[in-house]
């Protein structure tokens, strides 16, 4: 754990060299980077951490600006500049950090990313609500979301299963199409996330006043965008928005891959990140 001045964040650090910071997805925690952290720390100073209110980090009630926590973590670890590797909404936080402090970020790798200010299609949001209510009845779900109830383990397991099928796998796929260890790890992280979220003080992300959706043209650092071709099409569209909006960005498409390539295709993603980081390191 490290005290950033505003909270306490659980983190791991290994290796020496140029700094990279791995920012996990909202449906996971820092363990989703197990393979990448171990491999990349051979040549880089690798850092991974849990968001505030996630994993081993401190709880928080009320609004939280995760991109500011990321920059505060870099300050606490005396990292002046880093490549940020962010997945899902961790990618959104990485981009917001880069826009808030462009001198602190020398490259971005965005894996199935989210985006601050992006307006999700109503059909996508409606499907998510329907799936949640199919897993847990409305009355209990409302109580859980207020963080003032003891969650029923069967509700936790049901919600984790639904979320894993909807987001991690993607439409029309079955768990058998994912390596068993990847499916098990995804379910474990989701179960622990819901068990904690539903029994802890309620917090909500607070996004920058000037969101990334209107500022992609300001990003000039090398940017790699990774898209899983089996994940929800509306999430794939966000990756496309990044590649269209960031000049010179590169898109990597991974077939038969859902929302967490770091878990489902660890070797492929690690190789792609290593090649990208090597290019960044060799830039004049």
Where are these predicted regions, by residue range?
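Flexible "cap/lid" loop of the alpha/beta hydrolase fold
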Residues: 99, 106-152
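Alpha/beta-hydrolase fold catalytic core
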Residues: 1-20, 42-44, 79, 203, ...
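Conserved HGGG/HGGXW glycine-rich cap/lid loop of the alpha/beta-hydrolase fold
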Residues: 5-59, 66, 73
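Catalytic active-site module of serine/aspartate enzymes centered on a nucleophile-bearing elbow/loop
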Residues: 245-284
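Conserved loop-alpha-helix segment in the C-terminal half of the alpha/beta-hydrolase fold
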Residues: 38, 205-257
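Gly/Ala-rich beta-loop-alpha elbow adjacent to hydrolase catalytic centers
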Residues: 86, 90, 94
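Conserved alpha/beta-hydrolase catalytic His-Asp/Glu region
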Residues: 147-201, 205-206, 210, 215
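Conserved acidic catalytic loop of the alpha/beta-hydrolase fold
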Residues: 67-82
């Amino acid at each position: 754990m490290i005290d950033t001045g505003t909270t306490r964040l659980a983190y791991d650090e290994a290796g020496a060299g140029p700094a990279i910071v791995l920012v996990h997805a909202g449906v996971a925690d820092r363990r989703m980077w197990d393979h990448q952290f171990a491999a990349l720390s051979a040549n880089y100073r690798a850092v991974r951490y849990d968001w505030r209110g996630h994993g081993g980090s401190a709880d928080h009630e009320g609004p939280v600006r995760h991109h500011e926590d990321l920059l505060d973590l870099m300050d606490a670890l005396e990292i002046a500049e880093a490549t940020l590797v962010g997945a899902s909404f961790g990618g959104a936080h990485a981009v917001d950090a880069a826009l808030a402090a462009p001198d602190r970020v020398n490259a971005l790798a965005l894996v199935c990313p989210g985006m601050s200010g992006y307006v999700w299609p109503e059909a996508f949001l409606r499907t998510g609500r329907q799936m949640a209510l199919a897993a847990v009845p409305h009355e209990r779900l409302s109580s859980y979301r207020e963080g003032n109830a003891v969650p029923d383990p069967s509700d936790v397991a049901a919600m984790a299963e639904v979320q894993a099928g909807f987001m991690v796998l993607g439409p029309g796929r079955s768990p058998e199409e994912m390596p068993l260890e990847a499916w098990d790890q995804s379910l474990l992280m989701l179960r622990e996330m819901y068990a904690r979220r539903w029994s802890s003080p309620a917090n909500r992300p607070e996004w920058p006043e000037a969101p990334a959706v209107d500022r992609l043209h300001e990003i000039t650092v090398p940017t790699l965008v990774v898209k899983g071709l089996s994940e929800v099409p509306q999430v794939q569209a966000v990756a496309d928005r990044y590649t269209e909006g960031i000049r010179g960005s590169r898109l990597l498409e991974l077939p038969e891959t859902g929302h967490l390539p770091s878990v489902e295709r660890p070797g492929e993603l690690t190789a792609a990140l290593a090649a990208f980081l090597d290019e960044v390191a060799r830039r004049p």
